[in-house]
Amino acid sequence: MAAAAFAVPRGVQLRVLTERLLRGGVRELLRPRLSGSTPGSERDFSLSHSRGTVIVERWWKVPLAGEGRKPRLHRRHRVYKLVEDTKHRPKENLELILTQSVDELGVRGDLVSVKKSVGRNRLLPEGLAVYASPENKKLFEEEKLLRQEGKLDKIQTKAGEATVKFLRSCHLEVGMKNNVKWELNPEIVARHFLRNLGVVVAPHALKLPEEPITQRGEYWCEVTVNGLDTVRVPMSVVNFERPKTKRYKYWLAQQAAKGMASTSFQKI
């Protein structure tokens, strides 16, 4: 006699599969692969990296049990309070010591604090920085002392590198009057650097062409930053124009009003 076929509901099938997974499937998945065979497609959880730690403790203490017996747990014993969470706390920055000059960070020997992704993916692999260990700090302190004593070549500072980068993109205009005789000198150029570009340049750090500049035209000047880097800045000598300040604009308005008043009086 043939056995009768019954249709198993889909919900029952899913429940049976779930029970089978709970019995053996998950255990096999979590069991460490200790054999020397080639690993399969399952992930080896025993060798996976722990990315964080969460420490909790019971809110209610579990009473002591007799020898050889397990303590009796109640529902209140399954209430926990958080002690420490290293997985979700803010990530700390990475302290490094620069071995070379890096834009917007610093120069060799500077102690910087950057994101871990920046340090591990860019600075450390490219050899631009090293870890700020006590040994490395001591080495760079000794190097700094040797540079101060003059036994090693000096290096450009962070502000100096920013100044050099800025000067390479500048164009200086020097205004000279046409009613007097003049000759351009480093003091005049230094004042125009401060007035037009906002850069303080010492006269001894400026170098002009050997031929005297007594006429308007296109010239150049060289600026030496901290005695290390020299930048050639294009320079235009133009006719002097009075700066259009509020006081000067008010004076121009008064002159225009006086001129209009005199013209109308002559017509009358």
From Swiss-Prot:
Gene Ontology CC, one term: mitochondrial large ribosomal subunit
The organism's taxonomic lineage, starting at the top: Eukaryota, Metazoa, Chordata, Craniata, Vertebrata
Transit peptide: 1-52
The organism's place on the tree of life at top rank: Eukaryota
Compartmental location: Mitochondrion
Chief location category: mitochondrion
Gene Ontology molecular function terms on file: structural constituent of ribosome
Gene name, Swiss-Prot/TrEMBL: MRPL9
Subunit field text: Component of the mitochondrial ribosome large subunit (39S) which comprises a 16S rRNA and about 50 distinct proteins.
Assigned protein family: Belongs to the bacterial ribosomal protein bL9 family.
Protein name according to UniProt: Large ribosomal subunit protein bL9m
Biological processes annotated in GO: translation
Keywords noted in UniProt: Mitochondrion, Ribonucleoprotein, Ribosomal protein, Transit peptide
InterPro entries according to UniProt: MRP-L9_N (IPR056864), Ribosomal_bL9 (IPR000244), Ribosomal_bL9/RNase_H1_N (IPR009027), Ribosomal_bL9_N (IPR020070), Ribosomal_bL9_N_sf (IPR036935), Ribosomal_bL9m_C (IPR054302)
TM spans (from-to): none
Xref: Pfam families: bL9m_N, Ribosomal_bL9m_C, Ribosomal_L9_N
Organism: Bos taurus
